[in-house]
């Protein structure tokens, strides 16, 4: 008799299965009898017979001991064997009845990120039944073809897994030829500079391989875990990185869909922090179920501020008055605008410190982040000013009044790059069922933590929970400059109860988001793919600058989702629990080699 409990296939679960993940009905757990080669009916019959026979034998023996006044703890060899068989049969039967019964009647408790499945209103909101979503094929895609595969030698040939192919990391490097060996030795001894390998060899991949081998010999440290193959080193030559020896792999997760300005976006996030993508995804779910978020672009202008020095304070002040006079604005603007098709001067602001003058130029830069563009225009203006102010000494093209890659009040107040505000109204039932908290608790915690707490800490632009987490993850995945996360993460998060205290209004104001969709790391294959996913790849031909502005709005919307979810976890006391579940390494660090 077949006593297995067969899982019932559910149509609803099959429909909602995500791509690449089998539905729950198809996820079968191994049974106890799967390890035995006998047919199922024979295995069941064997263990049923064993259980009742051994039980009868033991009860009969114990009855005789009681009659003969023999201690029960004194067992013979046959009784010991019977006990072992009894335990084996009990374990087998529990594998069918006990565990299966528990799985069928006990439902796992919902974790911090799950919405209640029996809530029809939330399920309808979360079903994403929009025109663009209905066209999506939710069936399981075919398994991708795996290249670079080698047989696993350590497997048992008789095992069912012996014929499987497993992917091997690109760690093994082809042996060096005699010519390459000589080059490596020359690099090690210093006869050939490491930085000149690309120009001497004319092969960027070969140069990276030789530099890598030379580095290992010089330091005596292995780079076996750092991949070398599978990267286009020519694409970074003279643009992204010098003297490469490999590349670092960072996993990319997807949060969303983020419903922003009535459009859905799947947000790529490159991170090694567990729970970050899951938390942001929960925020996106809450925003989606509440009707979406709205963003507004307030400003769009990159800055560069050179520092110049004069012999007297008076001369420094004269240049300040000249540049800030509206009647004189057209002259430097004309000189500045000649440097680029897209760079357009928007304004000049000066600050005097003794004999030194700091000149802050602001300009539009199209779809580029624009730091190089504005620097080129500034240099042209400085060269022009030398004719009227020959005693002006240019001390540096950047005097930190910009201010780039540093927390600064000038960016927090005046803005730099894109200044964006994003808001959403989260419904009461969504706050309770998706975010597992309530509106009053969120409003109070936001005031105590993000506003008062940040003020107590003397924060500068840090009136938020973790904006930099989301900004950094999106920046890395889309090829932005990660160092500009410093000023780009300036954010103030506001929350208040609306609609008679039932719903939550949340907003993030970010005055200095510095992003671009052309130049720098955006042209790399992986980063370009992420930009394409968002629909902002490259420069916009119809409206120059619109792609970078949209990317800034998506960053702000993602920060809104991340802030909403983390604050909810804090208000509900779920932060530690979720991080223990999603942000814990399973590796024994004591066994890792240094």
Swiss-Prot record:
Name by which UniProt lists this protein: 3-hydroxy-3-methylglutaryl coenzyme A reductase 2-A
Keywords of this entry: Chloroplast, Endoplasmic reticulum, Glycoprotein, Isoprene biosynthesis, Membrane, NADP, Oxidoreductase, Peroxisome, Plastid, Transmembrane, Transmembrane helix
Glycosylation positions in this chain: 261, 337
One Gene Ontology term of the molecular function aspect: hydroxymethylglutaryl-CoA reductase (NADPH) activity
EC number from the UniProt entry: 1.1.1.34
Membrane topology type: Multi-pass membrane protein
Protein activity control: Competitive inhibition by mevinolin (Mev) is leading to a significant reduction of total ginsenoside in adventitious roots. Triggered by darkness.
Record Gene3D superfamilies: 3-hydroxy-3-methylglutaryl-coenzyme A Reductase, Chain A, domain 2 (3.90.770.10), HMGR, N-terminal domain (1.10.3270.10), Hydroxymethylglutaryl-CoA reductase, class I/II, NAD/NADP-binding domain (3.30.70.420)
CDD domains the record matches: HMG-CoA_reductase_classI (cd00643)
Chain's role: Catalyzes the synthesis of mevalonate, the specific precursor of all isoprenoid compounds present in plants. Component of the triterpene saponins (e.g. ginsenosides or panaxosides) and phytosterols biosynthetic pathways.
PANTHER family per record: 3-HYDROXY-3-METHYLGLUTARYL-COENZYME A REDUCTASE, 3-HYDROXY-3-METHYLGLUTARYL-COENZYME A REDUCTASE 1
Membrane-spanning segments: 38-58, 82-102, 550-570
Localization annotation: Endoplasmic reticulum membrane; Plastid, Chloroplast membrane; Peroxisome membrane
